[in-house]
């Protein structure tokens, strides 16, 4: 049957949704997300009690948002994603760079779409939040609201936190190793396991 369910957020903020899709309401998007979350939890409980109970959407739920059609910063976008991961237990947030195809006073001008590199940086930052234990507010903040397009977010974070380096590889805990550019999840596990 269904492996994953997705309710698209469409735009990062309620203001953006109100501006570009006034017939859609944030509550009408978040309510089905909550229902899916509750179904997943109930399914987990049933599997714990009844070994052969069917698993409700085993791959979890996801959502998608268009970035660049409204003026939200990368920080705002990542904070929304963090909130969705924390409060709705989403497995994945997809980001889609806005591509202008129609002229409208509410939309960015034609041929001024969102750079695909921005979308790529959002995906990289999302990966850091899901697998490297970063929080949105560690990567960006209101004073520094957008990613450096020229650097991947983990390297950019390291340059902003030079006081945490160098790291003694033989003594650093797993969490610290995850923050070292060039060390991934598997390498951090191997380093900790080899001690």
Positions of predicted regions on the chain:
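Conserved AdoMet/S-adenosylmethionine-binding subsite of the radical SAM
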Residues: 1-139
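Long, highly charged, low-complexity intrinsically disordered interaction regions
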Residues: 108-179, 188
